[in-house]
From Swiss-Prot:
Domain PRD: 68-173, 174-282
Organism of origin: Staphylococcus epidermidis (strain ATCC 35984 / DSM 28319 / BCRC 17069 / CCUG 31568 / BM 3577 / RP62A)
Record-linked Gene3D superfamilies: 1.20.58.1950, 1.20.890.100, CAT RNA-binding domain, PRD domain
Biological process (GO), any one: positive regulation of DNA-templated transcription
Molecular function, one GO term: RNA binding
Family, similarity comment: Belongs to the transcriptional antiterminator BglG family. GlcT subfamily.
Alphabetized InterPro entries for the sequence: BglG_antiterminators, CAT_RNA-bd_dom, CAT_RNA-bd_dom_sf, PRD, PRD_sf, Transcrpt_antitermin_CS
A Pfam family that the UniProt record links to this protein: CAT_RBD
Name this protein carries in UniProt: Protein GlcT
């Protein structure tokens, strides 16, 4: 049976070991209790997680985080990663475990100090990444119970972003950019229509999903096609919505410094017109 040589004990639940000249992080309840440097650990059921972080910088950062966290917080992180793994949304949790450990440890410290950070994109995250959001809710429910705290819904959104960035192969930055552009688009619509948009409607969900895929197409160099006469017809039928759609596309074009094809304005106009009809019927 394989053995690991202990090089450092971080706490009762986490130890740093080497095996075949490879440094690994072993996590398991009570795995570090009464353990000292130089002792060996067999690979058995007491080891809940084995992390082989490839990059030295990543290794050092993760070890520093684990030293900062209290035993029960580190255990809560382990349980959180298990919940996410069991969801089937991700295939490789190496990057996620570092990001999640970092986030949960500091979120817990902020909560204890009554210094919570507001998440302006909770609704957008909930609609765009519903599967990740549902799993994140389970994570937060578990953290609340395990740590005897009450994280606000903002934290569900933050955890969901970490899950989504791993499951959809997008960086947190990419997702943040998409959310910001959605917010800017909604601001343009609300300004032109002089009315707030209800973010709990199916129409809103469809709109933000459309913006998301529009941005995907731009980043991949893909584009929609539409006949010129169809574009002219939409412009004549829905002039106000068309004008608003034009503003949004110009804004996106500036943000990405890429050309946005005219065909995009057709489908965007139709989405905006749905908002206009919805508002006029109130």
């Amino acid at each position: 049976m394989s053995k690991y040589v202990i090089t450092k004990t971080l706490n009762n639940n986490v130890i740093i070991c080497t095996k075949n000249h490879q440094e690994v992080v072993l996590i398991g309840k009570g795995i570090g209790f009464n353990k000292k440097v130089g002792m060996t650990v067999q690979e058995n059921a007491s080891i809940e997680k084995i992390y082989k972080l490839e990059q030295q910088e990543q290794q050092e950062h993760y070890k520093t985080l684990l030293e900062l966290g209290e035993d029960h917080v580190v255990q809560a992180v382990i349980e959180s990663v298990n919940i996410i793994n069991e969801s089937g949304l991700i295939t490789d949790d190496k990057n996620l475990v570092v990001a999640l450990t970092d986030h949960i440890i500091y979120a817990y410290k902020r909560l204890k100090q009554h210094q919570m950070i507001t998440n302006p994109f909770v609704i957008e995250t909930k609609h765009l990444y519903s599967n990740a959001y549902n799993v994140a809710r389970k994570v937060i429910d578990k953290l609340n119970k395990t740590l005897d705290v009450h994280f606000p819904e903002d934290e569900i959104g933050f955890i969901a972003l970490h899950i989504a960035s791993n499951s959809e192969k997008l960086s947190i930055h990419d997702i943040s950019v998409i959310n910001k552009l959605i917010n800017k688009s909604i601001t343009i619509i609300e300004t032109d229509l002089q009315h707030s948009i209800d973010k709990q409607t199916i129409q809103y969900q469809r709109f933000i999903r459309h913006i998301q895929f529009l941005i995907y197409r731009l980043t991949k160099g893909e584009y929609l096609e539409a006949q010129e006469n169809f574009i002219s017809m939409i412009k004549t039928m829905y002039p106000r919505s068309f004008n608003t759609a034009y503003k949004i596309l110009k804004m996106i074009q500036r943000e990405f410094s890429v050309y946005v094809y005219e065909a995009e304005i057709v489908y965007l106009t139709l989405h905006i017109n749905h908002f206009e009809v919805q508002i006029s019927s109130e």
